[in-house]
Amino acid sequence: MDGLPPWERNIGMVFQNYALWPHMTVRGNVTYGLRLRKLARREIVARLEAGLRKVNLVGFEDRYPGQLSGGQQQRVALARVLVLNPDILLLDEPLSNLDAKVRVQVRAEIRRLQKDLGITTVYVTHDQEEALSLSDRVAVMREGRILQLAPPKELYERPANRFVADFVGTNNFLTGVCRGVEGDALVVETPLGVVRARRREDLAAGTPCVLAVRPENIALGRADGNTFTGRVVLASYLGNTLRYDVDVAGTLVKLDVRDPWHHELLPPGQEMALTFPPSAALAFPEE
């Protein structure tokens, strides 16, 4: 690919703002690139029909972009690229202008198309849910550098550093000092007290570090592991989740309860115990 001039690289591009010709119908927009390539009329018609089937827009051939919803316009932009049979597909935040429900629907369609067609796809997004749900591998970048390239599950559960842990999902961060290793746990002194974290061999005693604990990995009550007591500062009902902000020894800790139908929403000021296992606390060197 590096040895080819840009106009000879068979790359398809889908833009954030759709980039449709407003004076052209769906048919005109989708076949624009095919006509530039001077394909035979029969081939153009066949590719148009196949492309519209792939994006569920059969019957919309004679409509103009202004007569389509945002989701339908983005499907037209996808079809325009797919009819060119690209070797690589580039998508630059293609769903950012869509409403939440439509975004989820089109996201699922893009994933289905990518799997069905087997096209190598580079998808740029700031939406973490999009990145995790669409990708086979996710690259987290900062200032032009890739900090971690990994499958979504690995990226979420085993981030390479604090930046990745903070960028992907929600985390509680606790600053502390390593005190050494005990069994399978790394012992860290934090403002909450002593916390046992997932074991790391490269953090020596006395090393400043940061612990990351995801809200969904913290449970109500007392159990073996790390248990602390605090007071509810804010309680939020989010439908399938109860989100608590808890003051623990002057540190605000976020806690998610995933089965709210089994729990009453505790009011601000209520004392509560919270616990998490050592495996839920990831340690990183202080940056």
Stretch-by-stretch model annotation:
Residues 5, 159, 167-168, 222, ...:
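Short, flexible helix/strand-to-coil boundary loops that buttress conserved ligand/catalytic motifs
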Residues 6-12, 16, 20-163:
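ABC ATPase nucleotide-binding domains
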Residues 8, 92, 118, 170, ...:
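A structure-centric signal for secondary-structure junctions around beta-strands
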Residues 12, 33, 59, 70-71, ...:
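Glycine-centered flexibility sites
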Residues 151-179, 183:
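ABC transporter nucleotide-binding domain
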Residues 171, 181-287:
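Non-catalytic connector elements of ABC transporters
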